[in-house]
């Protein structure tokens, strides 16, 4: 996920041509990750900018790893995060650094540790644009869920309850949060509260136009959740057939078709 390096781009495109660090940031935001790494390595030759350059390179390597799953990319990201001095970063860059640590832990499958790192970013409440915060929130919820999967059912339900509470709070503060709308339904389902999951899925569907992309991504995600998880679970626990629940869901979507 490209999170919030856009916050740190202050140079124009023309200026980026003469400034390798600005060029690296611009290329990162354009998803040209190898070119961003190359520009960051050039910027690193200036000692005062080496740490910021390593941060851009680390984030670019993390994005490459998400696309390729090549272990070298994850190793390179970890190496750059390990060697940079966060005290030399600007405040917004330090937030990016912490998010990068969380992503690296997540990709290392240290999900509990990753969740703790993402939690610290969310709790700070500072220096994150709304869209970037939404993505960190998604990283957090996914890391928490993956961490709890092997645990006993009683433990899982308690964790899903925590996710629900967090998402309710997020929606109260940020009504356009697609992540909170989705995870409110997903966590209710994980907790075994299937009626609440169904209700939250419908609520997410109708509020989806608040999202930056007019709700296209949220609706697709909610539709998968309902059809692959909530409907089968409700059918098992009620007298309704999967076909009847599917028809009910389709009628609901038709009423709110855009």
How does the language model describe each region?
Residues 48-53, 89-93, 126-134, 178-179, ...:
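Boundary/linker segments of alpha-helical solenoid repeat arrays
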Residues 157-161, 165, 170, 212-258:
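Terminal, low-structured helical/coil segments at or just beyond the last alpha-helical repeat
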Residues 79, 119-123, 155-159, 194-213, ...:
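TPR/TPR-like (Sel1-like) alpha-helical repeat modules
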